[in-house]
Amino acid sequence: MEETYEIMATGNVPDMANLMLFLVIFAGGSLAWSSQLLERLNTTQAEASAAFTAYSRLALSIVEDDAHPVAASTIALASISILSHLVTNSDGFGLKVHMLRMRCLLMMRELKINSLDTPASSEERRLKGCNMIEIEVQRRIWWSMVASDWLIGFSGGHHEGAYIYQPRHMQVNYPANTDDEFITPTATDIDLPSSVPTAMSGFLFRVRTAKLCREIVDAMPSVLLDDNKADYHVVLAMDAKFQTLFKELPWFLQLDPENVEKSKEIVTQRPWIAFGRISGHFSLHSRLCRLHRPYHLEGMTNPKYAYSHEVCIRSAQTVLELRRQMDEAGAKIDIRPSRFWTVMQHVFVAALVLATDVSFSPDAPDAEARKAKVLMAYQILESSKQESSTLVESIQRNLQILMSALQKQRVQPPRESTASSAVSSGAIHDAFRDEALGSGLMEVDWDQLWTEFLAVAPDLDAQQWNSLLDDVDLGGFHPALF
């Protein structure tokens, strides 16, 4: 850093990869502000937000400068991958994110990272030597990008059911399960068993979750190409993989009270373990809920699918509870979950899933308790407005678009035929189209939105609910909107 500043002070141009790395680090620091940090620096939230925008745009301008392209290097690659993560969690899945991810893929291929651990590459390193720090960083970048790609493949949205990174086109070992200080330029044999907690435990948990998402995408019919639901035996087979993953997690990443209590000392020493555990299970339960959702309403009346209804609702409730726990765990490592688009997307969808349950069983003994959980999600989203108003306003707009579609359908009686699904789909697609064309939506506060939503929801039948939930995935989080 000192060298870069000295070069700039003399009027010379610094290495652009180094400069870009510093800019994304500064941007990340600006995004992770806390009230204590703002007070210590004698600055404001608005100034921190402005700094994030400035630093991230400067870094992006370096990436986009075709006249002076940044040469492929590990530092440049790390910078672009970090920038893609920051932009994703500040702006959603817009075109900039996909451009950055594609630049990462092309640069990794140029550096031959996709074949980093083939026998030929390993032998070349043995004969010529290498810097193992750089090799480990390359493995981390590769698997971070691969995991993001596979997770997006089973997260709803227009990218559902597809992924870019093909396993048979890569041979890259997982990063070592070790702490950074044990990685030296000549280090070998530094990989520890997964039962040993390290700074990489949460990262490797994410990779395992991503691998499961890829297996689901391979096994299930694509929602974009096939109108049919997956055969139920396929859903149950994928569910079994989730249960296996839950059981095989290291004890300190288990979510049961006994292991959480047992891991308190480790969490005190390594506070990121707690956040990794919470965020990992948050991701898993979001997708377990997604897996069973096509059958969860039918499971309310058909015993064959009762398990799907139970799992879907339980996982949605778990998502909301884990989101509540994230704040305390994140504060200890300066992470603010309320500023992450992906986190709030899962909270919003979990709330809608629980709303369907309330809608179909308004007189159930625990109906009020379940309605309270839906309202808790509203409170989570509302509380996020202080720190990320644009994020919450986008979710609020999506809910209002849903309301627009629901209001149109309210005059239509529920029907058993597939036509009801078509009406639902058409209504919501029209609502999203109108919004995209700039027809505008009335400014409505959260309390009114949620009250109206829960009032209208009981008028929908199962097919209409399923269609609405699918359209939230396919339309509500479209890059143009989110």
Stretches found by the model and what they are:
Residues S73-S81, F203-A210, E261, I273-R293, ...:
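Amphipathic alpha-helical protein-interaction segments enriched in hydrophobic
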Residues S361, M376-H429:
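Eukaryote-biased recognition of C-terminal alpha-helical segments
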Residues D91-M107:
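Classical protein tyrosine phosphatase
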Residues I62-D65, M107, S148, L245-E248, ...:
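Residue position in alpha-helical solenoids
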Residues M1-I75, I80-F93, L127-I133, D191-P197, ...:
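C-terminal transcriptional activation/regulatory domains of eukaryotic transcription factors
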Residues L116-E136, M326-V343, D363-A364, S384-Q396:
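Acidic, Ser/Thr-rich low-complexity linear motifs
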Residues A230, R339, E387, A419-F482:
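Intrinsically disordered, low-complexity transcriptional activation domains
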Residues E2, T10, S34-E39, R109, ...:
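Fungal transcription factor middle regulatory core
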